[in-house]
Amino acid sequence: MAATDVRPKITMACQVCKHRNYITRKNRRNDPDRLELKKFCPNCGKHTEHRETR
């Protein structure tokens, strides 16, 4: 049942340094595409684009 979970856990990776900084949950029905958010990257020391990784 966990494989077809509506709200799976996803990891967010920085697009600049490629570090996986955040783990969050998303609703697959509302957001079927990959999630892209601007978040703070502690490795870069600034706000950068973070994208969902698989």
Swiss-Prot record:
GO cellular component, as recorded: cytoplasm; ribonucleoprotein complex; ribosome
Keyword Iron-sulfur belongs to the record: no
A molecular-function term among this protein's GO annotations: structural constituent of ribosome
Keywords: Ribonucleoprotein, Ribosomal protein
GO BP: translation
Family membership: Belongs to the bacterial ribosomal protein bL33 family.
Protein name: Large ribosomal subunit protein bL33
Organism listed in the record: Frankia alni (strain DSM 45986 / CECT 9034 / ACN14a)
Gene that this sequence comes from: rpmG
